[in-house]
Amino acid sequence: MIDVRAPHLRPRVYRRPDDERPYQQRGGPRNNPYSRDRREMPQRGFQKKSNFFKPEIKITNDMQVTDGKHKGVLLRSTESPKVRPTARRIRETLFKVLNRRVKFARFLDLCAGCGAVGVEAISRGALLSTFVERSAKMCNFIKQNLDACEICPTGHGEIVQLECLPFIRRMKQRKRCWDIIFFDPPYDANYDEVIELISRGACIKAQGGILVVEHPAEMFFPQTIGFLTRRKVVKEGDTALTFYECWK
């Protein structure tokens, strides 16, 4: 029997090269083993479970400015597991300890990430926040967060795309210093080199400058490092803040 229907109306036929049976006996896509294998093969291009279209921007209440003139502004961060923004409770604890020393201070945020800590410092009255971050993508998030708070990047906010060590060495040569330095590197990073440079007087105010290090709670830092003296250690869950003061 000859099928006289137009080609586009005929049933789709899946045929092995050595199969000479009429198409009525070969079976359709559902019972054809070759069509089944074809559906199970990895497909090219975008996959159904791909995260390509998943938004990489994270905006939650945890990323909210907690106090000051920009209180309540939602900050942006990335969904990447490699980035660990400073939690809201840690920021609240940090500025509770610093208290009035933030006002009119020059604040340096090393390994700034999305810039939440530096933005919070400006909100609480800091004269200047300098954000040091090696990732161009995260520097863009910092700029967006400054724009959200209507902070001019050439005024109260300064963004530097650079690694921490080269930045500190460069600023040491220029004899530039800050009143408060906040250092929050990835937890698997080497803290020693950066702290050692700062302890020799690099980037920190000679009389009364403060260095705050965020680190895992099980990590311990000595009482004295160079010109730095440990004043306080505050633990919040599995995270701790160590406060050093510089007397040069």
Segment roles from a protein language model:
Residues I2-K248:
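Class I S-adenosyl-L-methionine-dependent methyltransferase catalytic core
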